[in-house]
């Protein structure tokens, strides 16, 4: 399917610099651009590529001014990266979609299936489960009894939504993710650890995306809640009774212990660990591998274990590199002081 620069500019409200009749049929990174491809430039580090790219159309920010000739047709927009996302969504929507239930899928008689749903081979839909309109269930995905999946969702292969859990509209669950497994709850006894039944559920609100092999545990009682717009990377662990605020994003291998509340619009780097029963405010940014043992107020930008402000962390890092030399210097100073004491005592 081809689109012209004129059509694209109209869709994303951009200004064309060059040939409005230039057409594209695919996407490419600016450094790998080919004729017939559309690319984008948002990071100044990649500016040199715009003068040599073979892409037919390039999205650029409005403040971009070429320093030499650019062969590609440019479309100037407020935010090139955001406009690219809109075009990619349009491209995905233009692809033909399958509907219907494959004969090799298992769908319980009591399940409710919406309109234009596709259920692939070997998918399993349990008793009294509900699947919303236009949702796609890929092979070997499982929706447990009584679970509810909203409209326009995608459940990729081997993703699992346990019984009675709730998934909102426009959610994406990537391969191998598990929604609603038991929380890690055990009571210590003289005979060992006795399992505490986890009778709660997980609620995913609208527009949530869950990465591959990410686990969100069901609550002991009540609900583990992931609010609207949350994006979780691969291999993230959300424990029982956690609550994650709207539009918070977490990179791979973040782990959050039970009953912690995370605010809205937070950003956590990879391998961040947060202890249980804490409150993390809104718009908190945590650098990679931060370890959080206590509450954090809104607007904080922290890194390290325990987390500290960025300036303090980088100052401490510089000092840390010098510790071996400082240790030698300290030993020498102690030795000199002891020698001076001995001389004074004579």
Swiss-Prot record:
SUPFAM superfamilies: Trimeric LpxA-like enzymes (SSF51161)
Pfam families recorded: Hexapep, LpxD
EC number annotated for this UniProt entry: 2.3.1.191
Signal peptide: none
Catalytic residue list: 240
GO molecular function, one term: N-acyltransferase activity
A biological process from GO: lipid A biosynthetic process
UniProt KW keywords: Acyltransferase, Lipid A biosynthesis, Lipid biosynthesis, Lipid metabolism, Repeat, Transferase
GO CC field: membrane
Catalytic activity from the UniProt record: a UDP-3-O-[(3R)-3-hydroxyacyl]-alpha-D-glucosamine + a (3R)-hydroxyacyl-[ACP] = a UDP-2-N,3-O-bis[(3R)-3-hydroxyacyl]-alpha-D-glucosamine + holo-[ACP] + H(+)
Superkingdom classification of source: Bacteria
InterPro entries with a match to the protein in the record: Hexapep (IPR001451), LpxD (IPR007691), Trimer_LpxA-like_sf (IPR011004), UDP_GlcNAc_AcTrfase_non-rep (IPR020573)
Enzyme class: transferase
Pathway: Bacterial outer membrane biogenesis; LPS lipid A biosynthesis
Matching HAMAP family: LpxD
Subunit and interaction comment: Homotrimer.
Function summary: Catalyzes the N-acylation of UDP-3-O-acylglucosamine using 3-hydroxyacyl-ACP as the acyl donor. Is involved in the biosynthesis of lipid A, a phosphorylated glycolipid that anchors the lipopolysaccharide to the outer membrane of the cell.
UniProt cross-references to PANTHER family, sorted A to Z: UDP-3-O-ACYLGLUCOSAMINE N-ACYLTRANSFERASE, UDP-3-O-ACYLGLUCOSAMINE N-ACYLTRANSFERASE 1, MITOCHONDRIAL-RELATED
Protein family: Belongs to the transferase hexapeptide repeat family. LpxD subfamily.
Record-given protein name: UDP-3-O-acylglucosamine N-acyltransferase
Source taxonomy: Bacteria, Pseudomonadati, Bacteroidota, Bacteroidia, Bacteroidales
């Amino acid at each position: 399917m081809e689109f012209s620069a004129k059509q694209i500019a109209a869709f994303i409200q951009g200004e064309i610099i060059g040939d409005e009749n230039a057409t594209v049929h695919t996407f490419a990174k600016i450094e790998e651009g080919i004729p017939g491809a559309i690319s984008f430039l948002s990071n100044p580090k990649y500016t040199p590529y715009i003068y040599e790219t073979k892409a037919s159309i390039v999205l650029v920010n409005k403040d971009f001014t070429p320093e030499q000739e650019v062969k590609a047709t440019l479309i100037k927009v407020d935010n090139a990266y955001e406009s690219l996302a809109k075009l990619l969504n349009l491209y995905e929507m233009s692809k033909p979609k399958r509907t219907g239930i494959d004969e090799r899928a298992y769908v319980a008689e009591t399940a409710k299936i919406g309109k234009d749903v596709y259920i692939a081979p070997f998918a399993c839909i349990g008793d009294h489960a509900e699947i919303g309109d236009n949702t796609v269930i890929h092979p070997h995905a499982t929706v447990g009894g009584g679970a509810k999946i909203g409209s326009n969702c995608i459940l990729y292969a081997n993703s699992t939504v346990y019984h009675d859990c709730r998934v909102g509209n426009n959610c994406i669950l990537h391969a191998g993710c598990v929604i609603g497994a038991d929380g890690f709850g055990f009571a210590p006894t003289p005979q060992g650890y006795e399992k505490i039944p986890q009778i709660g559920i997980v609620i995913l609100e609208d527009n949530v995306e869950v990465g591959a092999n990410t686990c969100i545990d069901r609550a002991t009682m009540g609900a583990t809640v992931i609010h609207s717009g949350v994006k979780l990377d691969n291999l993230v662990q959300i424990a029982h009774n956690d609550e994650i605020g709207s539009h918070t994003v977490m990179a791979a291998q973040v782990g959050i212990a039970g009953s912690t509340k995370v605010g809205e619009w937070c950003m956590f780097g990879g391998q961040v660990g947060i202890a249980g029963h804490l409150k993390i405010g809104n718009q908190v940014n945590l650098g990679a591998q931060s370890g959080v043992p206590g509450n954090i107020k809104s607007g904080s930008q922290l890194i390290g274990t325990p987390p500290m402000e960025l300036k303090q962390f980088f100052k401490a890092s510089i000092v840390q590199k010098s510790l071996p030399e400082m240790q030698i210097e300290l030993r020498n100073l102690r030795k000199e002081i002891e020698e001076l004491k001995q001389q004074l005592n004579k």
